[in-house]
Amino acid sequence: MSNENVADSDVRRKGGLGQRIAYACGNLGQAAFYNAMSTYFVTYVTSCLFVSYSKALAAQMIAVITGLIVVIRIAEIFIDPLLGNLVDNTTTKWGRFRPWQFIGGLVSSVLIVLIFSGMFGLVNVNTTLFIVLFIITFIVLDVFYSLRDISYWGMIPALSSDSHERSTYTALGTFTGSIGYNGITVIVIPIVSYFTWTFTGAKGQGQAGWTSFGFIVALLGLITAWTVAFGTKESTSALRAKAQKNGNPFEAFKALFQNDQLLWVALSYLLYAIANVITTGVMYYLFVFVLDEPAAFSITGIIPLIAGFIMAPLYPILNRWIPRRYLFTGGMVSMIIGYTMLALFSSNLPVVIVALIFFYVPAQFIQMTAILSLTDSIEYGQLKNGRRNEAVTLSVRPMLDKIGGAMSNGAVGAVALAAGMTGHATAADMTASNIATFKTFAFYVPLVLIILSLVVFWFKVKIDEKMHAQIVEELEAKLASGEIVDDEAQAVIKN
């Protein structure tokens, strides 16, 4: 075996059981954190944060806060590649990614408690100061959560350069992510209701309950981030040595825009993410204001939770025989069926439950295909442009999720205000116009986006397992022959 192959075997080898478990744990809290921020924070804002205000003033404040969230998140979209470049240029004895798991997990966990507490009651004391501090806090929170998210998924190519081994790590992260994301949906109302009653003796979802919910999410996020920080170890290879010199942010942006496969995968995933997060973001309103079945809302967490248990481990097994392109396509077709049923039968609970199965079950296949395609585009970009940008490339997915989250926040706020689904409103108050507005935002617009996502992926995304294997082989040959020259890469090969 050549020295080159010895070097590359470090990054190709299968990770130990402990490392796999530690890595998998990370997305449990990270996904729960994301769902709390992208979905339930706006639910908290529209239903509880301004409950002591007059109806007119509360509506104004809801519009202001949800608008600010959308603006902040869209603005920070352009920061994510810079954060990826920061991670790529991090050099510590812990490696490139683990320090940001430690720091990002700590800071974001502290700040999420702050925003779910109404800035510790400041919202009811000084509205202007509350808005100012909220903007600052939300920006800092979003930045440090992004650093955690980018470093988590950016770690995959540091663990293996083999496409199938990467799918194992991706499956583990997606599996626990499904538990965290959907588990929050299952427990949010019971937790908020329980702690509201415990601290105030009142029924419903009050401030004390939402603050307790924020604290639980923060604790889970901190523990799981630190599990990754202390439980994993990055590998080295000639391929990864190219990433040691990542240059300035301008070069990072240039590398992204020159990687055509990255851009097409990103566009397809963006269309999916916007559709998916908008719909999941307004599910609470479907059960409360359309179906008038708030007690059944937990089904929107139970179905995807069970689906995650089955589909995430199944993906790498099926992917050994079925190309991920077809797994992605099958998932999209299932979602189209689900959307159609939801749009036509949104007031029929049994049909809605069946539709939710079609909607939620394929999520793992779609998301894992996108993540793996983005990950494999790292070597594609390295071969095409001569630069390897791991964290910068993989910062694209969190950036796209952030766009989806911003759209979800905006859509939830718009639906709540336009359809009168705020404050003490009930299902009995809803009119046909209210329901039509809801269905347009929740189902019809996302359905169009899902169809467009499938079209882009099928006709523009070319990178697959076979193509990636050929790229890695060609890269290794060029590094060994000196056709691609990099001092640190050659040092790894020689050693």
Model-derived segments and their meaning:
Residues 2-495:
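Membrane-embedded alpha-helical bundles of multi-pass transporters/translocases
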